[in-house]
Every structure is written in structure tokens, then in C-alpha cells.
Amino acid sequence: MAQSQPPSKQYAVLLKRGPKWVAGKPAGEQALGNHGRYLQEQMTKGALQLAGPFLDDSGGLILYNARDEAEVRAIAKHDPGVVDGILAVESIRPFHLAFDAASGKSPFSAAK
């Protein structure tokens, strides 16, 4: 009998400016192209649920689907923005997406 995969959980990754963030340059002018491509790859794989920068250029938020925190830490560790030092992981926290506007799901949705 095939062993089933553990259910996917959600984790919020908070990013902050890293040591190689160029002061005085907004996020759109930082060397984050590889970071964006990496996030696209994670989205294609089904790991990334949503992501975006904070409007004050202090960092950003990524919501990942993963088996456990170790998997999320590995994904974040290999993010080119983190590897290059432009970004740094501030925290990783378990998250429960209770209200999802994209799917219309919520604890108050009518059962179908």
C-alpha cells in the first residue's frame, strides 16, 4: 500500500530588509528579479499561496503551503533574495487561512 503524504499546512513567512538592501532604493529598484522568479516557481509547484511586499518597503509576506515548518525553512533558505542578502527571514509562523476571498471559503460559507 502506498504511503500517503501528510496534509499540507500553511505558514506565514515575514521577510525584512537584509544586509545587502541598497539604502535609498525602493523595492522595485532592488536586485530582486531572481527572488520573483523563485516565488513564481514555488507558486507553480503549489507551495506558494500568496506573496507581496509591504508598501513601506520594510519587507514582505509570503504564505506557503507545506508539510511542516522544516520544509518552509528550506524553501525560504533557498530564496535568492535571502541567499543574496537583499532580504532576510524575520519569522515563520503557522497560519490558518480561515477566510479566503479567492475561493470564497470561510467558516461561515454555506455547506455544499
For the regions a protein language model found, what residue spans apply to each?
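Conserved, structured core segments of small domains
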Residues: M1-K112
